[in-house]
C-alpha cells in the first residue's frame, strides 16, 4: 500500500513538472517577446510612478467647461465653467 501511494505521488509530481517546464508552442517565441516587453514596461512604471500615463491627471483651464464632481480646475473652483 505504501509503495502504491509513493508511486501515485511520484507520477503526479512528474506530470506537474512536465507541465511546468513544457515549452508553450502555441504562443511561440514572438508572443513571448511581446509579453516580456509589456512586463518590463510595467516594472519600469512601478519603479518610477511618474513614467505612468495613468497618474497624470489634467486640470481644466479657467473658462473651460467642467463638471463639479468629476473635473478639476487648475484654479480650484468649478461651477460648470472653471473660474
Swiss-Prot record:
UniProt signal peptide: 1-22
GO MF term list: ion channel inhibitor activity; toxin activity
Disulfide bond listed as a keyword: yes
Keywords for this protein: Cleavage on pair of basic residues, Disulfide bond, Knottin, Neurotoxin, Secreted, Signal, Toxin
Localization in the cell: Secreted
GO cellular component terms attached to this protein's record: extracellular region
Cysteine pairs bridged by disulfides in the record: 59-74, 66-78, 73-82
Tissue specificity of this protein: Expressed by the venom duct.
Record propeptide residues: 23-55
Xref: Pfam families: Conotoxin (PF02950)
Predominant subcellular localization, coarse grouping: secreted
UniProt-listed InterPro entries: Conotoxin (IPR004214)
UniProt free text on domains: The presence of a 'disulfide through disulfide knot' structurally defines this protein as a knottin. The cysteine framework is VI/VII (C-C-CC-C-C).
Family: Belongs to the conotoxin O1 superfamily.
Name of the protein: Conotoxin VnMKLT1-022
Organism: Conus ventricosus
Amino acid at each position: 500500500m505504501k509503495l502504491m501511494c509513493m508511486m501515485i505521488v511520484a507520477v503526479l509530481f512528474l506530470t506537474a513538472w512536465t507541465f511546468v517546464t513544457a515549452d508553450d508552442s502555441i504562443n511561440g517565441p514572438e508572443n513571448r517577446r511581446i509579453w516580456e516587453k509589456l512586463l518590463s514596461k510595467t516594472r519600469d512604471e512601478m519603479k518610477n510612478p511618474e513614467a505612468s500615463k495613468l497618474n497624470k491627471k489634467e486640470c481644466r483651464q479657467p473658462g473651460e467647461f467642467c463638471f463639479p464632481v468629476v473635473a478639476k480646475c487648475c484654479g480650484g473652483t468649478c461651477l460648470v465653467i472653471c473660474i
